Amino acid sequence: MHFLPEKLDDYVIAHSQKEPKLLQELSRETWQKVLAPRMLSGHFQGRVLSMISKLINPKNVLEIGTYTGYSALCLVEGIQTNGELHTIDTNEELYDFQRRYFNKSGYGNQIIQHIGNALDIIPTIDKTFDLVFIDADKKNYPNYLKIILPMLKSGSVILTDNVLWTGKVIEELQKGDKDTEALLKYNKMINENSQLETVLLPIRDGLTMTRVK
């Protein structure tokens, strides 16, 4: 989903930090070999994730939804030298693909991969997270929020992708559309929670930045 005319979109990208070569390589291989390559964060959003992480300088990062590892490599750019990034995905077939790029990045020892149901895995990680990125199955967004809130502290930031869902959030809800229904619920939850402050950014398919007060 694009909010700017194509020429303006190109201008924005041209005047933002260049995409690192490793991420260019990862993106190219994803498009060549992996199903649903549009799930990639992509150049501009990836640089946004990187910038936010660098501004926060987190010790512990949680990512829900790894895919091929692009966004994890963006988020880890701002991590502390003794920090960890825990990333969770259900697709075990992409594990080796992810690990190959994680090891190439120089952050391999700081990125910990988990395969399985995030709702089961998250409670087993004994960490307080400074930064969380949610980009997984939409129907569980409200559940992810509930389970991660106790693992955050004042100043922690939650980034959430696809919160505009190609515009479906402002259209009439279709019967049986559980993903859009869950996103509507999630967007309301984070906006109405008095312990959170939220801004919804019109980047790609909608990116929410939420800070714990």
Where are these regions (language model features)?
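A short alpha-helical cap/connector motif
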Residues: 1-131, 138-159, 163-213
